[in-house]
Amino acid sequence: MGSGRVPGLCLLLLLVHARAAQHGKAAQDVDECVEGTDNCHIDAICQNTPRSYKCICKSGYTGDGKHCKDVDECEREDNAGCVHDCVNIPGNYRCTCYDGFHLAHDGHNCLDVDECAEGNGGCQQSCVNMMGSYECHCRDGFFLSDNQHTCIQRPEEGMNCMNKNHGCAHICRETPKGGIACECRPGFELTKNQRDCKLTCNYGNGGCQHTCDDTEQGPRCGCHVKFVLHTDGKTCIETCAVNNGGCDSKCHDAATGVHCSCPVGFMLQPDRKTCKDIDECRLNNGGCDHICRNTVGSFECSCKKGYKLLINERSCQDIDECSFDRTCDHMCVNTPGSFQCLCHRGYLLYGVTHCGDVDECSINKGGCRFGCINTPGSYQCTCPAGQGRLHWNGKDCTEPVKCQSSLGASKAMLSCNRSGKKDTCALTCPSRARFLPESENGFTVSCGTPSPKAAPARVIHSGNSTVSSSCHEAAVLPVKQRASFKIKDAKCRLHLRNKGKAEEASRILGPGSVPCSDCLVTFIHLKCDSSRKGKGRRARTPPGKEVTRLTLELEAEVRAEETTAGCGLPCLRQRMERRLKGSLKMLRKSINQDRFLLRLAGLDYELAHKPGLGAGDRAELVEVCRPGQHRAGTKCVSCPQGTYYHGQTEQCVPCPAGTFQEREGQLSCDLCPGSDAHGPLGATNVTTCAGQCPPGHHSGDGFKPCQPCPRGTYQPEAGRTLCFPCGGGLTTKHEGAVSFQDCDTKVQCSPGHYYNTSIHRCIRCAVGSYQPDFRQNFCTRCPGNTSTDFDGSTSVAQCKNRQCGGELGEFTGYIESPNYPGNYPAGVECVWNINPPPKRKILIVVPEIFLPSEDECGDVLVMRKNSSPSSITTYETCQTYERPIAFTARSRKLWINFKTSEANSARGFQIPYVTYDEDYEQLVEDIVRDGRLYASENHQEILKDKKLIKAFFEVLAHPQNYFKYTEKHKEMLPKSFIKLLRSKVSSFLRPYK
């Protein structure tokens, strides 16, 4: 992976291969070497080539392959490296040694044979070994016989030669005249005194180990070119000055020759010359946690995917992918060696890390009886006009009730009373209070049910009376009032009122004390917000002071049946408005006097506390958790789902049987529909309420007693009031069917299809939808803005985002294939343009890239100067490379194009880049072109680590910060990586040091 020339060559080879595949079938190549139709020499090798062959002479021969001649290595000046004789053989040579020598292990040197070591050399008495030969010696009183091995005892008197004083060095011969004549053994010459014998080169190579030359003074020894003569003048020893003494590595001259040694990581072999690499991984895995890879003279630890090597270069630590930017769209869970992305409720995972909204309405219409509206992360069922309101299960529609009395429902209550100059007010919510803490300094409380946004009732005037056209039409819109109060220097928090104050409030707000007792308040919405204001010069509030603002919305019912001849609906509405306004005036005074209570779930809460309280009261408010929270250690934690905050015990209590709570931090639980006080404790939603009809059943309200779904219908959910028909006249094999799969269809549809009940055929899922199951009557729409490449998709994994990814900044950025790290879609084209600031150039790092090789380069990534095919190309590839590479752009600007075919797909890429000062171009080029940057697996992992690549970019983009960088990040990078960069950066920044 690298420059544009290599991928270009690959494309050319693929093109040639494709054309050969089209036109070359008829002209099939013949292997002449196999058939024996070649005319190569017997000492040549036949090598087949397309449409021909070639002949190559074997090693040790020379020629054109059709005529080969043996090379006589013994004719070389160094005698082929042989120290004695060289014997040429066909295609090779061998070294031989003179008598008295044997061939060394290297096959070239000759070493002395110690003849005395075996059978005493055949000597009768003593044997003396010499270089290239040996001699037999006799003890005193004996002399050596003519056979030079046995010893003869000398007589005291007798023949001359038997006399011990005959004077011959070797052999004594008696002459006819009674004298003696001395002779020498073979290989010796008689000296001028006719008694002594002089050694020549013909005996034992003159005592020389290598070469011998006869001189008047005797043999003169010499050595082969790779050796030097020892101080004894006979032995040849190796020297470090010549060919490093034959050592593989380090050589030391010693009295006995050379002494070879090996560096750390190598072991000296038995020949005392060769160094062999030590495989450290064989012993205890080299101390590596995961993977040990032996290298020449050393070893390298590496980690499994999902782990990183620590600075001790032995231990592996899990990579916390969740700490990276852009790892997951929603939630990220780190796991050993990997991670998992999770999506919020109502969203579905696609492309490994992305979350898209689920269109629940495409899944069997969301289970809704009538209409379904998809919303981000959820959906909502709707009921058409005349079909009643939405059922508690959120999917069915209840039958409209024509005449419903407003007296039966629990109402909210605004109670105010005056005692002297003090006004005391309380907002009471008997049930279904919704408490929502919006922030640390704010909350909202709602009570009752807001009026629907409906048109006013049609009223028919008949004489002096007013009559509605029907009971349903007689509903009159309620009177609405909205007020806003501001309290300075107050905290916007609810605090449980102490017992004494609560009893006092009960006396003040006793029976009959409600000035608006005939005001049927149906809905209350209170919003409280505290904030610091007054930071500006013109602000009225002093800087740093807190301001609490209360916003109250009230709805009061107006009864049409209370109209009289003297007061119609407009009159009733005006009366109600005056009463509400009067109550709000008293409410304002009670708030300013800190005499306002909020009654929720039978407990009284003070809404806001002004700073005029006593020290004891203020101390009581310190570190107090707000309602809906309990203390867990030193923190305030909201009560979880399925519980409510019990103000008296200040604890979270599970919802009683027959109730549920879907929200956190609530002050009460909601009653289950049709509750008979049965069911589990701590129910978290309405579906867990007891007594619901199970799947395959229905009832009028969704609760028992239930009826099984009749044949030809089904119901997959609990608590429903109806069953869905199979459609198309289809029936089911039994009652109580729970799925369309129970419908007796005429054909069985496989995944990627849905059953059309109108034509009773299986239809392929359209592009942008999928179906993973058999025998279904719908296809699920792909999440978010994703789509599929083709129709008939069977999995959400085939849903892909077609948008080109990346962020293009002036100094740093990245490009990303669509749907990364999931497989990219087919038939897309992406174009990115990188335009760096003036006097800056572009550095690209490709950590890894995945493109299908079997696609015949249908998916291509190319980086050029511009869109013109003839412009300067920086990088081009159509293959997968998991080995990272860094390179500089060959042009100041880059036009990047990624195009995919309709065939195979792969993960694609995420490629970061950085722009650097052109003054450092030489340094940056020196770094990224050094092969050592990629030789080590640990260095490669640096280029893949999203955190380290940022740090690496700092060095490459701003080399002057290198030394500060190494101190700051020395624990992040392996020593070998820092060592690699140190010399380059130092020599560039300090060229004269």
From Swiss-Prot:
InterPro entries: cEGF, CUB_dom, EGF-like_Ca-bd_dom, EGF-like_dom, EGF-type_Asp/Asn_hydroxyl_site, EGF_Ca-bd_CS, EGF_dom, Growth_fac_rcpt_cys_sf
Single Gene Ontology BP annotation: positive regulation of BMP signaling pathway
Signal peptide: 1-20
Nucleotide-binding recorded as keyword: no
Tissue: Highly expressed in femur and humerus with little or no expression in non-bone tissues.
Superkingdom field: Eukaryota
Alphabetized Pfam families for the sequence: cEGF (PF12662), CUB (PF00431), EGF_3 (PF12947), EGF_CA (PF07645), Ephrin_rec_like (PF07699), FXa_inhibition (PF14670)
Disruption phenotype: Knockout mice are viable and do not show any macroscopically visible abnormality at birth. At day P1, however, knockout mice are shorter than their control littermates, and show misaligned upper/lower incisors and altered craniofacial development. All appendicular (forelimbs and hindlimbs) and axial (skull, vertebral column, and rib cage) skeletal elements are smaller than in control animals. The defective skeletal growth persists up to adulthood.
Record keywords: Calcium, Disulfide bond, EGF-like domain, Glycoprotein, Repeat, Secreted, Signal
EGF-like domain residues: 29-69, 70-111, 112-148, 157-198, 199-237, 238-276, 277-317, 318-356, 357-398
GO molecular function, one term: identical protein binding
First-listed, main subcellular location of the protein, grouped into a coarse class: secreted
Processing after translation: N-glycosylated. Proteolytic cleavage produces a CUB-containing C-terminal fragment that retains the ability to bind to TGFBR2. This reaction is catalyzed in vitro by MMP2 and, to a lesser extent, by MMP9.
Carbohydrate attachment residues: N417, N464, N685, N756, N785
CUB domain residues: 804-916
Subcellular location: Secreted; Cell surface
SMART domains assigned to the protein according to its UniProt record, in alphabetical order: CUB, EGF, EGF_CA, Ephrin_rec_like
GO CC list: cell surface; extracellular region
Disulfide bonding pattern of the chain: C33-C46, C40-C55, C57-C68, C74-C86, C82-C95, C97-C110, C116-C127, C123-C136, C161-C172, C168-C182, C184-C197, C201-C212, C208-C221, C223-C236, C240-C251, C247-C260, C262-C275, C281-C292, C288-C301, C303-C316, C322-C332, C328-C341, C343-C355, C361-C372, C368-C381, C383-C397, C804-C830, C857-C878
Subunit relationships: Forms homooligomers. Forms heterooligomers with SCUBE1 and SCUBE2. Interacts with TGFBR2 through the CUB domain; this interaction does not affect TGFB1-binding to TGFBR2. Interacts with BMP2, BMP4 and BMP7; the interaction is mediated by the CUB domain. Interacts with BMPR1A, BMPR1B and BMPR2; the interaction with BMPR1A and BMPR1B is BMP2- and BMP4-dependent.
Function: Is a positive regulator of the BMP signaling pathway, required for proper chondrogenesis, osteogenesis and skeletal development. It acts as a coreceptor for BMP ligands, particularly BMP2 and BMP4, facilitating their interactions with BMP type I receptors. It is required for ligand-induced recruitment of BMP receptors to lipid rafts. Binds to TGFBR2 and activates TGFB signaling.
PANTHER family, sorted: SIGNAL PEPTIDE, CUB AND EGF-LIKE DOMAIN-CONTAINING (PTHR24046), SIGNAL PEPTIDE, CUB AND EGF-LIKE DOMAIN-CONTAINING PROTEIN 3 (PTHR24046:SF2)
The protein, known as: Signal peptide, CUB and EGF-like domain-containing protein 3
Lineage of producing organism: Eukaryota, Metazoa, Chordata, Craniata, Vertebrata
Gene expressing this chain: Scube3
